[in-house]
């Protein structure tokens, strides 16, 4: 447990400390005040995630091995893609049913999504860095701590994964995904299924947000009913999504192995 908390604190310290340093360098080099209207947040997020990965790999806090991918689990990766696509709408719908939580990172997220370069930070670097840290390091340490109760480790790692986002509005979705990603890591011992799932999730969210911002939609206040036209259509869409997610989850249950 101590190792898992240590890794989480280190990641947060790098994000806050190094992020502030990169923002200062940005301001000195470009003469621009760092904010969400320019590329400073994209640069900061990308640099911080890259350095986090280098640190965790260099100090061997996270383990990355080609053993699992050498088994050629292409069908498993396809089911990961489908599972990610199938859970998106139900997760958003579930979040809308919950009491509204503060979205303290809304402005920053909109700034990242509004630029095509934001995909580097959201769609590429975030899945790699977060899976390396939270599954490759944090969950690995938790599974070693309590090998007799893997769901405890998975739940704790999912909670830490949700908390590190530091945005209450994102936490329910992050925790839900964290449980699934943790289970996939436990079954395979590899972060690759999680990276693929995470990449698809973030890519779809980025693409949808970018398109909606490009056409002038008010993404800040948009609900699923606004997008689909009625609550009935929303429920139909959620049901169709579950018809994708649940069979995908079943196939992963059958196929995931180390």
Spans of model-derived segments:
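Hydrophobic alpha-helical transmembrane segments
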Residues: 5-9, 43, 77-82, 116, ...
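Hydrophobic residues within alpha-helical transmembrane segments
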Residues: 10-14, 125, 156-160, 172, ...
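Alpha-helical transmembrane segments in multi-pass membrane proteins
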Residues: 10-60, 76-80, 235-240
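Juxtamembrane helix-loop-helix connectors linking adjacent transmembrane helices
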Residues: 26-27, 31-40, 62-132, 139-145, ...
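Structural signal for the C-terminal ends of transmembrane alpha-helices
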Residues: 55-65, 184-188, 246-256
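Membrane-interface helix/loop boundary segments of multi-pass membrane proteins
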Residues: 129-156, 183-190
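Membrane-interface helix caps and helix-loop-helix hairpins in membrane proteins
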Residues: 163-169
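C-terminal membrane module of polytopic membrane proteins
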Residues: 199-258
């Amino acid at each position: 447990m101590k190792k898992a908390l240590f890794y989480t604190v280190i990641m947060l310290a790098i994000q806050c400390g190094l992020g502030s340093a990169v923002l200062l360098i940005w301001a000195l080099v470009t003469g621009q005040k760092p904010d969400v209207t320019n590329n400073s947040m994209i640069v900061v997020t990308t640099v911080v995630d890259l350095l986090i990965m280098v640190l965790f790999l260099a100090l061997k806090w996270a383990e990355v091995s080609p053993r699992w991918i050498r088994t050629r689990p292409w069908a498993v990766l396809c089911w990961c893609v489908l599972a990610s696509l199938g859970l998106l709408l139900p997760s958003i719908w579930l979040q809308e049913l919950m009491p509204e939580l503060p979205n303290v990172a809304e402005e920053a997220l909109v700034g990242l999504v509004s630029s095509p370069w934001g995909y580097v930070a959201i769609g590429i670097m975030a899945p790699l860095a977060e899976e390396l840290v939270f599954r490759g390091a944090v969950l690995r340490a938790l599974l070693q701590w309590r090998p007799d109760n893997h769901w405890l480790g998975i739940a704790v790692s999912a909670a830490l994964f949700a908390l590190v986002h530091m945005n209450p509005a994102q936490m329910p979705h992050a925790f839900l995904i964290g449980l699934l990603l943790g289970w996939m890591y436990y079954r395979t011992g590899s972060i690759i299924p999680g990276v693929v799932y995470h990449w698809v999730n973030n890519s779809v969210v980025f693409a949808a947000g970018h398109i909606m911002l490009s056409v002038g939609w008010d993404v800040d206040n948009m609900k699923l009913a606004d997008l689909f036209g009625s609550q009935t259509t929303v429920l139909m869409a959620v049901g169709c999504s579950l018809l994708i997610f649940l069979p995908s989850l079943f196939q992963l249950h059958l196929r995931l192995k180390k």
